[in-house]
């Protein structure tokens, strides 16, 4: 039996039409929550995930501490650009998102599901549909 198998992954995503920082803001928020969870709750197996991403416990500990003190929005403020980049979100402007999806495709991913976060998710859905999908389908 010969079957095609899709290799899929769910990726943190957020987009803005023109402002890269605003487009990365939602991804920064969910990355903060995920990273805090890795530090606080998933010892052991999380170390492997962090190693693969090139993240150090000391690097993300401030994210977890901020989550404990002030919740997800406080944690978001501790997610630096360097940390966010290591998390490999599909985030930023439409052009940034196209480039990020191409990276996933080049790595062998054949099915990408987006976990949208941030402001105005309906607008984000529209932007992905109109300004990203036409360039990455195929």
Residue map of PLM features:
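Active-site-adjacent structural elements that line small-molecule/cofactor binding pockets in enzymes
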Residues: 1-138
